[in-house]
Swiss-Prot record:
Cross-referenced NCBIfam families: PRK05610.1, uS17_bact
Keywords annotated in UniProt: Ribonucleoprotein, Ribosomal protein, RNA-binding, rRNA-binding
Species of provenance: Desulforapulum autotrophicum (strain ATCC 43914 / DSM 3382 / VKM B-1955 / HRM2) (Desulfobacterium autotrophicum)
A Pfam family: Ribosomal_S17
Gene name tied to this protein: rpsQ
GO biological process, one term: translation
Database matches in PROSITE patterns: RIBOSOMAL_S17
Protein name, UniProt field: Small ribosomal subunit protein uS17
Length: 85
């Protein structure tokens, strides 16, 4: 299979939109503990590029991997799945 054209797509929640054209998205995933085999929720925060500046805190967004846009930004907001209440 061709791995070169495949880009990671992650689903997460916007936790910060204070920057200009950037948001911080927190992605949750289940990870199994190596010894105890219990599933634990792990969190990771990604800086993502938001060109339209429509994302608000609490929105559920889909982010797609892209070329490096800055020191920390490697993702773009591809769509807003669910708006915050």
């Amino acid at each position: 299979m061709n791995e070169r054209g495949r880009k990671r797509v992650l689903l997460g929640t916007v936790v910060s939109n204070k920057m200009d054209k950037s948001v911080v998205v927190e992605v949750e995933r289940l990870v199994q503990h190596r010894v105890y085999k219990k599933y634990i929720t792990s969190h990771k925060k990604y800086a993502a590029h938001d060109e339209t500046q429509l994302c608000q805190i609490g929105d559920m967004v889909k982010i797609t991997e892209s070329r490096p846009l800055s020191k920390t930004k490697r993702f773009r907001v591809s769509e807003i799945v669910k708006k915050a209440v």
